């Protein structure tokens, strides 16, 4: 379960997220809807600790989430709007790097990488560097990377943007 209490984020004089109280139960699907600039991406960045709140708190299974809680951070994975991957690395290297960040055994990283790249129809492109991938392929790789650690909480910020219709359908 993930819960926020009075979650607020300000940037100078602009309040992007204002006193958000939210409770999402285990197994529940939840969407943030709103126009551009409504604070959806900022909220996701706060929930994943990419940003720190100005005030308020985030609880994972009743425990306060901070950047100093790797045990709780391991439960969360995020797919951001931006292609946040090193452009000079290939797919295998991206997946290896992600797995090592979470102290996964190499054998498990290799097994999950194979499984996920196959699932997303990327296996034959695995040695291409990120800079040589299409937008849709980058997006699929971000999905693979996010699922690698088998997270309990998956935060998605426009995960199928840039994908063709068939890829979007496969993803959902």
Where are these regions (language model features)?
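Conserved ABC ATPase signature
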Residues: 129-133
